[in-house]
Amino acid sequence: MKKPRVCVVGAGVIGLSTAVRIQNELPNYDVTVLADRFSPDTTSDGSGGFWQPHLVGGDNQDMVIQWGRDTLNYLFYLATSPLANRLGAQMVSGYSFFSEPQCPEWRHLVLGYREVDSREIKLLFPRARFGMFYTTVMIHVKAYLSWLMSRFKHNNGNVIDARIDKLEDLVKEYDVIVNCTGLGARKLINDHDVTPIRGQVTRVKAPWVKLFMTYQGTHGHCENYILPGADAVVLGGTGQEGNWNTGVDDEDRKMILEGCVEMMPSLKEAEVVRHWTGLRPHRTSGVRLETERLAKGKLVVHNYGHGGAGVTLHWGCAGQVVREIRTAFTPNFSRL
């Protein structure tokens, strides 16, 4: 019997995790990853690797919670497994502060969620009017991408370094196409609902920082955050929709450092390791995860538009892609 062929387009955390999960759950499929950018040059590489739904739009928030739950459970597994050291996966506890009361739907997914009292706010960040404490997971995304690629190749996955102009170029060679191109979908399939949300972060050496701290003001974006990663503390950040600038902006750098030092004064003398900027793939209408019919009856499964929640949703979305493929294609291939 001929093996059905799958091509996953895109090699960030969404693309690689999707390819690996297809291999895991559909072992009779031949899987290829095709991309023109690989780690360490993907947007995912600069991510803080922090699990929390962030800058993800749309009305399908029930699915965001479902995908987020599946991903968080998987990350908790990695953080408590022997793989934790290799992946920089760790459970982290800390505070999220706000300028007004919040009731996030994801509060039931994290561990130990509680609203903080006025004493904690006054002691830690008096400018805030509301706060919460909880435990979540962080992962070193560069290490994670390397591990995913190793797993993919070990499972006989094919890797092609190339750029395509349209998905239809792949229909002759592949039975299933999975579109994980992120911001690239704007040009590749003419989806102008995909827009960049520019993110800039600074990484510093601050091994004394053990708790994360975030602050969200009235603009609706996380104005500043401090995330204690495995190799550095990540300071952020920006959420500039429609900004295509991939250079490090000095004003943003100043805002990040000053804002984070206000939250945690001990960072004032921390050594700066590097600055980074990336463009998050945001869709106002929400994550696009659905199938579409192409020429000759071939189907593409779209999986893009995760905004600032790529790490937060990746494994759950990969599982949804597998379900889409299994439902749409298994009956057809039984006749080959």
Can you annotate each of these PLM segments?
Residues 49-128:
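Dinucleotide-binding Rossmann-like beta1-alpha1 core, especially the glycine-rich loop
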Residues 2-14:
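Beta1/beta-strand and adjacent pyrophosphate-binding region of the FAD-binding site
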